[in-house]
Swiss-Prot record:
Localisation: Cell membrane
Extracellular topological segments: 128-783
Glycosylation sites: N139, N213, N529
UniProt protein name: Uncharacterized protein TRE1
Note: Present with 396 molecules/cell in log phase SD medium.
Single GO biological process annotation from the record: protein transport to vacuole involved in ubiquitin-dependent protein catabolic process via the multivesicular body sorting pathway
Alphabetic keyword roster: Cell membrane, Glycoprotein, Membrane, Signal-anchor, Transmembrane, Transmembrane helix
GO MF terms, alphabetically ordered: carboxypeptidase activity
Keyword Plastid attributed: no
Residue ranges, Cytoplasmic side: 1-109
Length: 783
């Protein structure tokens, strides 16, 4: 038969001799094992092989499982698991035998288990890496700032900054207008989206004014007809005085400095009625006060050209903050407490009208003035009182009681909820305000986003509270910031230990510089770790008015982070040209973006240290050095009859305080980081909190409750503005204001009284530290 199945036929073999018997045995065997008596029938069909059915998936899985079990599981069980189990069982028996010699086996097992778990937990805590991603310091209690900053660097969203800025600067938004209402809603919505708890939207009533009717008519010598200079709503100074003047002589006064006015007075140019025509100076408030003091009936400010545009007008406030900030009609109290005073009694309001004009408009008047009188450094002449006369009308829309709003958000601290810092920025602008103040508002919103992302990502809380505030009413003599301070004076003085203002940050010039004005306690904080930055930092004392002024006046340390161009209000700030379209290309520039990212990271780093370092990072050493040096210079300005012994006794006590603090902090650092004390002992933590409490009160306790002589708004006897400030000498202009004002008028007996008062304040505040025996040192042997 033909082999059609392809298998090999077996070779012939010899058959067994006993054939019949084998057949019988074979049949019996087959029946015994259940085999069929006949072989199966194989059907041949056309000599073709049947195709095999495909193997099912479940069969493949079963075959793989069996293979894996045979080749892996069984060998591992046989060669590893079973021997290990035998070893563990043997060790357990030996261990139980050992425990039975000590006590009850079950009890001793549980004690051993607890000890082992405690050791493991301690090792995990000490490892700086916890399962939730939060990195703690080596003491098991403090956050890992490096980890937080690494995350912040990756999370800075420049596209969000651009989107926020484009919207916020898309409309004029003076306080109390519909534009401000829209921006406030946007900011509150941003707070809410970032999960920031809205601590409140504070509304205050304040003196405000808005563009109204203005007109200016010019008459040259012997001209009775004259000509009009067209004015519009851009010819407006916030806080300006209303008035109407007819046929009044005008003279040019350069920048109306004290020297300029003295020169003009010497030449008899300030006799009778006159209007001053001036270029904007560094301090508009001082120009206003100078004009009033010398008897001017009005003042007209000439704006500088912006590039080739000589038609731009800078709308600067003309309030007088050297007498105080806030609502002009409720000085030193929040508006709802008592009835407002009359506007004529308000010291911080100017008493003469003012308007700003463009360079082109100013040239029309300057062209009429003769080349006589005083010649100034810009080669312009004052002219004479007979050269030109003006009709001037200033009729702004005054609202004596109009709302301004502050928006306040908060992240609560985990350790010292009674201590806090504030990060703030102004919000309002007479125009679009892209470069200032809108960019500062956007920086504030971005900081909020970064902080809240760190809170969620790492389940993190700072040790102390942090407030984020968008101040309103800044163009109305810092009304929003001041009224908040006046409403909550005691609460803020007891809780807030630093105000950081980010409103003057910018990336618009090529200097890549940051100007930081701050209290001497904060100087070391802002100067350290600057080697790897893409920008330079210059730290100086506070020498500028702003939303921080009411807090400085009450002794709270402040820090103002500024870019030079914004700080000096360079063009196009305060003009209608300060629009998003002007700066969008700079904002999208890669290098500018890198600088902005570095600035944002710098702000996070420094604010993080302030709210999350175990110690409030105040440098008593720098503060003491500052006091000693500055007071020695102050003494040189006085005759020998003025005795400074009480003052220098105060600085000596502060030197002792410095040594005490440095000793305690050094011992604390050694205990926590050198001796391996992973958990801060409770008594040490309480003493550290006491140090923080005393540190936070240094500034507010160095104030006079009754305020400075003739300027009672200012309580701070060490830091604050003189009545007449000099931009070229910020240290003398903004330190020991009452004493320096009295030195200026050579009232030496009053200087002696004020020096003694200062000495008493320094001595008493130093003794707060020195008399606390718990803060003299740490006995590390006890821990």
């Amino acid at each position: 038969m033909v082999n059609t199945r392809g298998y090999t036929t077996l070779p012939n073999v010899e058959e067994p001799a006993n054939n019949s018997q084998d057949e019988l045995n074979s049949q019996d065997f087959e029946q015994a094992i259940g085999m069929p008596s006949e072989p199966p029938v194989y059907v041949e069909e056309m000599g073709m092989e049947e195709p095999q059915a495909p193997e099912a998936f479940s069969e493949k899985v079963q075959r793989f499982r069996m293979c894996f079990e045979n080749n892996v599981v069984i060998p591992v069980k046989k060669n590893v698991v079973d021997p290990l189990a035998q070893m563990i069982s043997l060790a357990s028996e030996k261990f139980d035998l050992f425990l039975s010699k000590i006590g009850n086996v079950m009890v001793m097992r549980r004690i051993f288990y607890i000890m082992m778990m405690s050791i493991i937990a301690a090792l995990i805590i000490a490892s700086d890496r916890l399962p939730n991603g939060k990195a703690r310091g080596s003491n098991g209690s403090f956050s890992d700032h490096d980890l937080l900053l690494q995350y912040a660097r990756k999370s800075i969203d420049l596209s969000k900054i651009e989107r926020d800025l484009e919207y916020i600067s898309s409309m004029p938004h003076m306080s109390g207008t519909s534009g401000d209402a829209a921006i406030r809603h946007y900011i509150k919505e941003s707070f809410d989206k970032n999960g920031i708890r809205l601590a409140g939207e504070e509304e205050f009533m304040a003196y405000s004014n808005y563009p109204g009717n203005v007109s200016l008519r010019v008459y040259s010598k012997d001209d009775t007809e004259g000509f009009d200079i067209p004015l519009n709503e851009e010819n407006f100074n916030p806080m300006s005085h209303n008035g109407q003047l007819n046929n009044i002589p005008v003279i040019y006064a350069n920048k109306a400095s004290l020297d300029d006015m003295a020169s003009m007075q010497d030449q008899g140019l300030l006799n009778g009625d006159f209007i001053l025509l001036v270029h904007y100076g560094d301090y508009v408030f001082q120009q206003m006060l100078t004009a009033q003091e010398y008897g001017a009936k009005a003042i007209i400010f000439i704006s500088e050209p912006y590039q080739d545009n000589k038609d731009v007008i800078q709308m600067k406030s003309v309030a007088l903050p050297q007498y105080g900030t806030g609502d002009a009609l409720t000085p030193e109290w929040e508006g709802s407490i008592r009835d407002p005073i009359d506007a004529t009694e308000a010291k911080c309001l100017p008493k003469i009208p003012s308007i700003p004009i463009s360079a082109n408009q100013g040239d029309k008047i300057l062209a009429i003035l003769s080349d006589t009188g005083v010649k100034f450094s810009n080669n312009l002449f004052s002219g004479s009182l007979n050269d030109c006369r003006l009709d001037l009308l200033v009729q702004t829309a005054i609202r004596e009681r109009h709302p301004v709003h502050d928006i306040v958000g908060k992240i609560e601290g985990s350790e010292q909820a009674g201590r806090a810092i504030v990060i703030a920025a102004p919000r309002n602008s007479a125009s679009y305000g892209t470069m200032y103040p809108s960019f500062g508002t956007v920086v504030l919103l971005s900081l909020i986003q970064l902080y809240q992302e760190m809170v969620y990502k790492f389940d993190w809380k700072p040790l102390r509270n942090i407030y984020f505030i968008s101040f309103g009413g800044s163009e109305f003599n810092e009304a929003g910031a001041t009224e908040l301070m006046e409403k909550r004076t005691e609460a803020l003085k007891s809780e807030i230990y630093t105000i950081i203002d980010v409103g003057q940050i910018g990336i618009w010039d090529d200097s890549n510089n940051l100007e930081i004005q701050c209290h001497p306690l904060l100087v070391d904080l802002f100067q350290k770790n600057m080697t790897s930055r893409k920008f330079n930092v210059k730290v100086d004392n506070v020498h500028q008015f702003g939303d921080w002024t009411p807090y400085l006046a009450q002794g709270i340390p402040v820090a103002i982070i500024s870019s030079p161009g914004v700080m000096n209000r360079e063009h196009p700030i305060y003009t209608v040209e300060d629009k998003f379209d002007f700066i969008k290309d700079k904002l999208r520039d890669k290098k500018k973006g890198e600088v902005l990212s570095e600035i944002m990271l710098y702000l996070v780093e420094k604010s993080l240290e302030l709210i999350d370092d175990p110690f409030i990072p105040f440098s008593i050493s720098n503060y003491v050095d500052f006091l000693s040096t500055t007071l020695k210079d102050l003494q040189k300005e006085c005759p020998d009859t003025v005795n400074f012994d009480e003052v220098f006794l105060g600085t000596t006590l502060w030197e002792n305080t410095k040594l005490q603090f440095e000793k305690w902090k050094s011992e604390w650092t050694e205990l926590m980081y050198g001796a391996g004390t992973y958990i801060e002992p409770t008594i040490i933590a309480i003493n550290r909190w006491s140090w923080n409490y005393l540190l936070s009160l240094i500034g507010v306790t160095q104030c006079l409750e009754e305020g400075l002589m003739d300027r009672t708004f200012y309580k701070n006897v060490i830091f604050g503005p003189k009545l007449w400030v000099d931009k070229g000498d910020p240290l003398r202009s903004w330190t020991f204001p009452e004493i320096r004002d009295t030195i200026a008028i050579k009232d030496w007996s009053s200087v002696q009284v004020q020096a003694n008062t200062l000495g008493t304040i320094l001595q008493n505040t130093a003794r707060y530290f020195l008399e606390n025996k718990n803060l003299h040192g740490i006995n590390t042997n006890e821990f």
